[in-house]
Amino acid sequence: MNGIIPLWKERGMTSHDCVYKLRKILHTKKVGHTGTLDPEVEGVLPICIGRATKLAEYVTDEGKVYVAEITLGKSTTTEDATGETVNTKELAEISAAELQAALTKLTGKITQIPPMFSAVKVNGKKLYEYARAGIEVERPSRQVDIYSLIRLDGDTALNQSNPTFQLEIACGKGTYIRTLAVMIGELLGYPAHMSKLERTRSGFFKKEDCLTLTEIDEMMQASDSSFLYPLEKGIESMAKLVIEEEVYAKVLNGGLLPTSLFAEVENEPRAALIFKDKLTAIYKPHPEKKDLWKPEKVIELNQA
C-alpha cells in the first residue's frame, strides 16, 4: 500500500496517535505524518503510506492555511486556551482599522520565537520538557512566511464584551499560530492568546478532501482503498522531468546523471523524475560536480 491520505485529525488526538491507529487500520508499519498538530487542534494532516513516506519532508514543506480564534485581554503559559493565565488587561475599544494595521504589519517575512510549550529542541531536549520542569531557556528565533491574514468575522470593533476575532492565516512551514496571536496582541498593546485553531489546508490537500479515522476504517473493511492519493500528489509544486527507459535504469541504481539532461529545470533546487506517469526519483544538483545531478530520493517501482 503506497500513497498519501488527507486525514482529518480530530481534537483530542496527537499526530502520533493518528499514525498508531492508521498502522492498525491499514495493517502496515510504513506510516508517517507530515508535521505535528497539537492535540487540541483539529484539521488537515496528510499521512504518507509505504513508499510515500520518502516524500513526507516535501509535503511538510508546503504552505498551510488555518482558521484561528484569537482572544485579547489575556495571555497564558502555553499561548493557547490550555495554559494557565499569566496576564490580564481590560480592553478599551479597538477599531477594525487598528486591528487591520496590526495584521498588515505581520504579513510577509516575520521573526518568531517558539513558545516554551513546543517540540522545538534546545540542547537535545524538547522545549516543553523544560517548561514542565519550570525551566525557561533561551529559544532560537526563526524567520517564517505569513502570506495573508484575513479577518473572517466582519469589521466590528473589539472591546471588553467582545474580545475575540476570527482570522484566516495562510503561512509557510514552521509558523506558530499561538505565537502569532501573542504578536498581534503586543502590537495592539494587550496580552493575547489563541483560543481555538483549525487547519483547513496543508499543501495540496483541503478540508473537503479529508476523511476521519473512522471513515478510513469503514472503507478498509469494505476493501475500498480509494482514500489513497498517488505519490505524485505530494510533489505537485516540484519541477518535473519525464525520462526514458535508458535513464530510468540508471535512476533505479541511484546513478548520477548529466546536467544536460536537466536543461529545462536547471534553475530549480530539485526535480521529480517521471517514468510512465509515475514518480521514480527526486534529483538535485551535485554539490561538488557541476556537470552532474545526484539522487536525493529514489522511489522503487513495481513495473508490470
Curated annotation (Swiss-Prot):
It holds the Pfam family TruB_C_2. Transmembrane segments: none annotated. It comes from the Bacteria. It is an enzyme of class 5 (isomerase). The active site is at D38. One of its GO terms (molecular function) is RNA binding. InterPro entries: PsdUridine_synth_cat_dom_sf, PsdUridine_synth_N, tRNA_psdUridine_synth_TruB, TruB_C. It catalyses: uridine(55) in tRNA = pseudouridine(55) in tRNA. Keywords: Isomerase, tRNA processing. GO terms for biological process: mRNA pseudouridine synthesis; tRNA modification; tRNA pseudouridine synthesis. NCBIfam families: TruB. Responsible for synthesis of pseudouridine from uracil-55 in the psi GC loop of transfer RNAs. This is tRNA pseudouridine synthase B. It comes from Listeria monocytogenes serovar 1/2a (strain ATCC BAA-679 / EGD-e). The gene is truB.
